[in-house]
Each structure stands twice: as structure tokens, then as C-alpha cells.
Amino acid sequence: MTLAGFLLYIPSLTPTTPDITMSIKAGDQAPDFTLVTKTAEGPQLVTLSALIGKSNIVLLFVPMAFTGTCTIEFCEISAGLADYRTLDATVLGISGDNPFAQAAWAEKEGITIPLLSDYEHQVAKAYGVAYDRFLPEANLIMGGVAKRSAFVIDKTGVVRYAEVQEHPKDLPDFEAVKACLRTL
């Protein structure tokens, strides 16, 4: 993909996207999406449906790069990535940051999971995890920022675990995520 093509890229969702006012829950079909990740070869597109069937998927939404709790979460997940691979899972991190900021964050902090850019917040909305107003008490009134959340998607594309945190400093229960993966 050329830089010009990348700059014109708009993330896509399938037309069967569920009501975005409700969070996706266990038993729901995972909404498909295509997002950008920055690799050593340049920007690449990642489509969820292309990954379905190859392994189980763990989607981790975080509010934004270069923030304390998000950095802690993704560094801990990166350090324990072998555990997820043993459980036949691919872990993907999603935030609303642009892919170049995500790549700089990953390089600075040693984050090794693929980071997907939901720059227009379409996927956060499709999964029902977008804040209407993110931290207005701190004057960070940014709509669409993802709530910290975790989803386990099985090889058939069905959500088997869903956890959405209302407070941005609260981490998902990663032991529960792993317990779910052990059942798949």
C-alpha cells in the first residue's frame, strides 16, 4: 500500500454491524472489521474475518497510546504472549491512535502485540465500547475513545468472553480471558 493509498484508507465494517448502543456479549457473532497496523514493511491492513479459523482471537481495546494504564496492560500482555500462543490465541490491541503513533509507542515501550488503528472509532462503536465523552472531569472530552475491554473470539467468529471496563484505570481480568481460552 502506498502512503497516498494509506492516507485515503477508511476503516470498513460489514453491513451486518449490530446496534452500536449495546456492548457485544458472549454468544454474539463478532463484528468484522478491517483496520491498519504499522509493520516494518509499512502500513498493512488487518481484517478480522481473514483471521477467523486460524486461531482464537483476543481483542484488547484501550483508550490511547502513551498513557500509564494502557502501557502497563500491553507491556504485561507482550511479556506473557507465549501463554496466549500456547492457548492457540492471537492477541490484537486496538486504540484510536494513528498507526504511526502506535508504532512509536510499541517501539518505545517494547510492546510486541499487533496494534490496530481504529482512528475513526468505528470498531469501538461496533463493539459497543466507545465513550460518549472520555474523562470530561479531566477536560478530556473526546467522544469515541474506546473503553478498556477484552473480547475472546473463537475460531468460528463467535464471541466467547466479553468484558468492558467503565473506568479507564481498571484492567480486564486476564485470568478469566485465559480460562475462557482453555475451554476452546
Model-derived features with residue positions:
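Aromatic (phenylalanine/tyrosine) cluster motif
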Residues: 6-9
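Chalcogenol-based redox active-site neighborhoods
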Residues: 13, 18-184
